[in-house]
Amino acid sequence: ASFSEAPPGNPDAGAKIFKTKCAQCHTVDAGAGHKQGPNLHGLFGRQSGTTAGYSYSAANKNKAVEWEENTLYDYLLNPKKYIPGTKMVFPGLKKPQDRADLIAYLKKATSS
Protein backbone atom coordinates (compact mmCIF):
# COMPACT_ATOMS: atom_id res chain seq x y z
CA ALA A 1 0.00 0.00 0.00
CA SER A 2 1.20 3.50 -0.74
CA PHE A 3 1.30 6.61 1.41
CA SER A 4 -1.83 7.91 -0.36
CA GLU A 5 -3.74 5.03 1.27
CA ALA A 6 -2.13 5.53 4.69
CA PRO A 7 -4.15 6.67 7.69
CA PRO A 8 -3.66 10.30 8.79
CA GLY A 9 -0.44 10.68 10.76
CA ASN A 10 -0.29 12.01 14.32
CA PRO A 11 2.99 13.88 14.93
CA ASP A 12 2.73 13.46 18.73
CA ALA A 13 2.47 9.69 18.39
CA GLY A 14 5.29 9.86 15.83
CA ALA A 15 7.49 11.70 18.34
CA LYS A 16 7.14 8.77 20.74
CA ILE A 17 8.03 6.30 17.99
CA PHE A 18 11.07 8.40 17.07
CA LYS A 19 12.18 8.53 20.70
CA THR A 20 11.93 4.76 21.20
CA LYS A 21 12.94 3.44 17.77
CA CYS A 22 15.07 6.09 16.04
CA ALA A 23 16.69 8.56 18.46
CA GLN A 24 19.47 6.21 19.53
CA CYS A 25 20.92 6.56 16.00
CA HIS A 26 19.40 9.79 14.58
CA THR A 27 18.84 13.40 15.57
CA VAL A 28 16.54 15.94 13.89
CA ASP A 29 18.00 19.19 15.22
CA ALA A 30 19.59 21.76 12.92
CA GLY A 31 23.34 21.87 13.45
CA ALA A 32 23.42 18.73 15.59
CA GLY A 33 26.09 16.22 14.67
CA HIS A 34 25.62 12.76 13.28
CA LYS A 35 25.19 9.74 15.52
CA GLN A 36 25.35 6.12 14.33
CA GLY A 37 22.98 7.36 11.60
CA PRO A 38 22.87 10.74 9.87
CA ASN A 39 21.20 13.86 11.24
CA LEU A 40 17.74 13.97 9.64
CA HIS A 41 17.30 17.76 9.68
CA GLY A 42 16.24 18.89 6.19
CA LEU A 43 15.26 15.33 5.24
CA PHE A 44 12.28 16.14 3.01
CA GLY A 45 13.32 16.90 -0.56
CA ARG A 46 16.86 15.63 0.00
CA GLN A 47 18.39 12.83 -2.02
CA SER A 48 19.44 9.66 -0.20
CA GLY A 49 23.11 9.44 0.74
CA THR A 50 23.86 13.17 0.44
CA THR A 51 24.04 14.61 3.98
CA ALA A 52 27.38 16.38 4.40
CA GLY A 53 29.81 14.82 6.85
CA TYR A 54 28.16 11.40 7.05
CA SER A 55 29.71 8.23 5.62
CA TYR A 56 26.90 6.51 3.72
CA SER A 57 26.87 3.03 2.20
CA ALA A 58 27.32 2.88 -1.56
CA ALA A 59 23.79 1.45 -1.69
CA ASN A 60 22.32 4.57 -0.09
CA LYS A 61 24.21 6.88 -2.46
CA ASN A 62 23.38 4.81 -5.55
CA LYS A 63 19.65 4.56 -4.74
CA ALA A 64 19.43 8.33 -5.36
CA VAL A 65 15.86 8.50 -4.07
CA GLU A 66 14.33 11.81 -3.00
CA TRP A 67 12.94 11.58 0.52
CA GLU A 68 9.29 12.57 0.79
CA GLU A 69 6.13 10.95 2.19
CA ASN A 70 5.83 8.19 -0.44
CA THR A 71 9.47 7.13 -0.41
CA LEU A 72 9.74 7.25 3.38
CA TYR A 73 6.53 5.24 3.74
CA ASP A 74 7.97 2.46 1.56
CA TYR A 75 11.47 2.67 3.06
CA LEU A 76 10.27 2.54 6.67
CA LEU A 77 8.28 -0.64 6.01
CA ASN A 78 11.47 -2.58 5.25
CA PRO A 79 14.67 -0.52 4.89
CA LYS A 80 16.87 -3.43 3.80
CA LYS A 81 14.42 -4.41 1.06
CA TYR A 82 14.05 -0.81 -0.18
CA ILE A 83 17.81 -0.14 -0.15
CA PRO A 84 19.65 -3.49 -0.17
CA GLY A 85 23.05 -2.86 1.41
CA THR A 86 21.95 0.01 3.66
CA LYS A 87 23.85 0.33 6.95
CA MET A 88 20.60 1.02 8.80
CA VAL A 89 19.97 -1.97 11.07
CA PHE A 90 16.39 -0.97 11.93
CA PRO A 91 14.01 -3.73 10.72
CA GLY A 92 11.18 -1.33 9.86
CA LEU A 93 7.70 -0.40 11.05
CA LYS A 94 5.11 -2.89 9.84
CA LYS A 95 1.98 -0.97 10.93
CA PRO A 96 0.77 1.68 8.45
CA GLN A 97 -0.35 3.91 11.34
CA ASP A 98 3.12 3.84 12.92
CA ARG A 99 4.74 4.81 9.61
CA ALA A 100 2.21 7.59 9.01
CA ASP A 101 2.73 8.92 12.56
CA LEU A 102 6.52 8.86 12.25
CA ILE A 103 6.42 10.63 8.88
CA ALA A 104 4.07 13.31 10.30
CA TYR A 105 6.55 13.86 13.14
CA LEU A 106 9.59 13.91 10.84
CA LYS A 107 7.94 16.38 8.48
CA LYS A 108 7.48 18.78 11.39
CA ALA A 109 10.67 18.08 13.35
CA THR A 110 13.18 18.04 10.48
CA SER A 111 12.09 21.38 9.03
CA SER A 112 11.93 23.52 12.19
From Swiss-Prot:
Pfam families: Cytochrom_C (PF00034)
Principal subcellular localisation of the protein: mitochondrion
Residue numbers of N-acetylalanine PTMs: A1
GO molecular function, one term: heme binding
Keyword Metal-binding: yes
GO cellular component, one term: mitochondrial intermembrane space
Keywords: Acetylation, Electron transport, Heme, Iron, Metal-binding, Methylation, Mitochondrion, Respiratory chain, Transport
InterPro entries: Cyt_c-like_dom (IPR009056), Cyt_c-like_dom_sf (IPR036909), Cyt_c_1A/1B (IPR002327)
Post-translational modification note: Binds 1 heme c group covalently per subunit.
Modified sites of kind N6,N6,N6-trimethyllysine: K80, K94
Entry's localization field: Mitochondrion intermembrane space
Residues that hold heme c according to the record: C22, C25, H26, M88
BP term (GO), one: mitochondrial electron transport, cytochrome c to oxygen
Protein's UniProt keywords contain Repeat: no
Family as reported in the entry's similarity comment: Belongs to the cytochrome c family.
Role this protein plays: Electron carrier protein. The oxidized form of the cytochrome c heme group can accept an electron from the heme group of the cytochrome c1 subunit of cytochrome reductase. Cytochrome c then transfers this electron to the cytochrome oxidase complex, the final protein carrier in the mitochondrial electron-transport chain.
Further facts: The tentative assignment of Gln-24 and Glu-69 is based on indirect evidence (electrophoretic mobilities and comparisons with other cytochromes c).
Name of the featured protein: Cytochrome c
Species of origin: Triticum aestivum (Wheat)
